[in-house]
Amino acid sequence: MTRRTHKGVTLIEMMVALIIMSIGLLGLAGLQAATTKYRITTMSRAAGTGLVFDLSERIRINADAAGPSFMQSGSEVASLYTIASDWTAQQKDSFSVSKNCNTAACTSSERATFDLLTWRQKVRDSMPQGGAMLSGNKRDGITVTLMWFDKEFTDGSSDATLVKAPTCNDQQTGMAQQTCCPAEAKAAEGVRCSRFSFVP
């Protein structure tokens, strides 16, 4: 009588393979969840870059309405490209345009009003509960603060409490300066800010 050796996969080897595969699939599911979590922030920041470029082009086209230039002396002319209302007030704004400067001739002042209304509508459409603040002029530079609501902006605890973005101050530099919200914005919990500056 000869003894035959068993060939093939045993049940135990099969179970080990299934366990290893299950752990791998759980890892992939976790990676997918993390990717989805950061998607809103990434998309909003990417949209913000395009929005700032759009605004800078609008201001360059209508530079006379953006305040004094380097060459001007004498009386200060305030920039018409400013937005000072806080985030909560902006959520209630309706952006009705009285004169469409794309189809009718407009003065520099009317063009600035039209530009801001249409640009603010783009901000709201591109970002969840989007808002913006603008300050400065073409001589000193324009500072743009984009604000949006991010339900994932939490403290990391198990109850996922929304946190408030840091308030801007003079001591901040680098990323802290670029992601803080101005005090005037009165940003609610869960609102993120992204700040940009440019000279038209």
Task: Cite the ranges covered by each PLM segment.
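Aliphatic-rich helix starts adjacent to a transmembrane/signal segment
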Residues: T2-F53
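Flexible, low-complexity segments enriched in proline/glycine/serine and punctuated by aromatic residues
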Residues: F53-P200
